[in-house]
Amino acid sequence: MSINTSGKITSATERADSADFRTIIRNKIPLMDVRAPVEFGKGAFDLSINYPLMNNDERADVGICYKQNGQEAAIKLGNALVSGQSKARRLTQWQTFARENPQGYLYCFRGGLRSQTVQRWLKESGINYPLITGGYKALRQFLLNELEQLALHPLTILAGNTGSGKTPFLAHCANSLDLEGAAGHRGSSFGSFVTPQSNQINFENKLAEQYIRGDFSLEQRLVLEDEGRLIGSVHLPESLRNAMTLAPLVVIEESLEYRLEQIYQEYIIKMTAQYQAAYGVEQGFTAFSEYLEHGLFKVRKRLGTQRYGQLKEIQSTALTQQNKGQPQYHLDWLKPLLSEYYDPMYQYQLGLKSDRVIFRGNNSECLAFLRD
């Protein structure tokens, strides 16, 4: 495929529409989503970008027209709404995407009129661009089926106290999946990131995409981090959750000092940098402070009113000192939070499933065990 001097994409062999979802996901093929923004916001795919045929209001008007007057009238209204300058602007977006992503595909909800319309208008402009057969709905169903396959694998669950390094540990395991990465949340009261968390549909899509790209054989054992039913605001697929509750556990054991340093770097140093990169130094520090305060507030009932008040005061002092260039003061409230709240809670939870523990050790020992 090439682009000629007139800017039109030409090809000796025109690319066909595709239902080869596995190859599309595995190879990270760019996708152009022509659904309305409201649809895209409810759920999309990892490498998709939204260049809609109709905006939200136009889609709603066409939908009402379809219900009241039928398909022919709805198509006529759609053509009237997307015409002139609005059509030209959108066509330019589609053309640019096609030129920049000659290996890509486009899709609407079911692979019907909307994607076919965009495909036809592109063709009239000299660009032959294929679509996803069955659209979003078909690809979404494929990913849901893959999640069911994931739950059939033999699993090993990686457990350990807060700060033991479970998530970075997974990066060293070729046969692992990062549930928290797919969820966009680290699972604890302080687990949110600067960017908003994935919604449920996007979490499922991202997890399935990650699984497909791992190209695992069905008999291959997978390593997953120990998680509750919820990771932030999203929940694990039921079949996967059920499989995880029966799987053997490998427990990382590291000292309080080691874990405290991990927490300090991850939740203080890195999060400060991320907030300030997103919002600027002053606004970023304010947002970071609110993030920490909110995290502590969420565990106030478990701490008790008096202890929460004490740690809140220490945290406030630490933020003041950090703003003066001394972030190490955060250790004064992080240490008791770990030793008095997170450690007892996690040890209680681990005690309920101690019969499933097959190995305990530090990071290096656990990694060696899983590689054997």
Curated annotation (Swiss-Prot):
One GO process term, biological-process aspect: tRNA wobble uridine modification
Catalytic center residues: C108 (s-selanylcysteine intermediate)
Catalytic activity: 5-methylaminomethyl-2-thiouridine(34) in tRNA + selenophosphate + (2E)-geranyl diphosphate + H2O + H(+) = 5-methylaminomethyl-2-selenouridine(34) in tRNA + (2E)-thiogeraniol + phosphate + diphosphate; 5-methylaminomethyl-2-thiouridine(34) in tRNA + (2E)-geranyl diphosphate = 5-methylaminomethyl-S-(2E)-geranyl-thiouridine(34) in tRNA + diphosphate; 5-methylaminomethyl-S-(2E)-geranyl-thiouridine(34) in tRNA + selenophosphate + H(+) = 5-methylaminomethyl-2-(Se-phospho)selenouridine(34) in tRNA + (2E)-thiogeraniol; 5-methylaminomethyl-2-(Se-phospho)selenouridine(34) in tRNA + H2O = 5-methylaminomethyl-2-selenouridine(34) in tRNA + phosphate
Rhodanese domain span: 25-148
Domain of life: Bacteria
Enzyme class of the recorded protein, top EC level: transferase
Record-listed E.C. numbers: 2.9.1.3
Molecular functions (GO terms): transferase activity, transferring alkyl or aryl (other than methyl) groups; tRNA 2-selenouridine synthase activity
Keywords associated with the record: Selenium, Transferase
SUPFAM superfamilies for this protein: Rhodanese/Cell cycle control phosphatase
UniProt keyword Transferase, yes or no: yes
Function per UniProt: Involved in the post-transcriptional modification of the uridine at the wobble position (U34) of tRNA(Lys), tRNA(Glu) and tRNA(Gln). Catalyzes the conversion of 2-thiouridine (S2U-RNA) to 2-selenouridine (Se2U-RNA). Acts in a two-step process involving geranylation of 2-thiouridine (S2U) to S-geranyl-2-thiouridine (geS2U) and subsequent selenation of the latter derivative to 2-selenouridine (Se2U) in the tRNA chain.
Record's subunit section: Monomer.
The family this protein is said to belong to: Belongs to the SelU family.
UniProt-listed HAMAP family: tRNA_sel_U_synth (MF_01622)
Name listed for the protein in its UniProt record: tRNA 2-selenouridine synthase
Organism expressing this protein natively: Colwellia psychrerythraea (strain 34H / ATCC BAA-681)
Lineage: Bacteria, Pseudomonadati, Pseudomonadota, Gammaproteobacteria, Alteromonadales
